[in-house]
């Protein structure tokens, strides 16, 4: 990222990220790695919406159908690492973050275990620090 920012700075450019809403909400990115950017053009689109946008834009089907993967190790896929499909993840995220639905109600509605919903909600909570300005000490007066 340092090199990318070096060249962006030389030309007064911004660094564009590739994160989508699904990845951002659960913290599926490296804080100062792939998450380091000045803007996220698809940051308010769930992964399933990114797929629909790709189809609308006539992106090659071979690209759309390729399983998302960070490429961290051989045969690694995002969905295996997350623990569920993006389709299910996005439904949970939508109901929890945009409809303020309770865990048990989400599980009922989607006919899944409450443990799966809890796992995602925990990912959201554990990664909250990734989307915030770092903490710093406050000045005090004597």
Where are the language model's segments positioned?
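ATP/NTP-dependent adenylation/nucleotidyl-transfer catalytic domains that generate, transfer
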Residues: 2-142
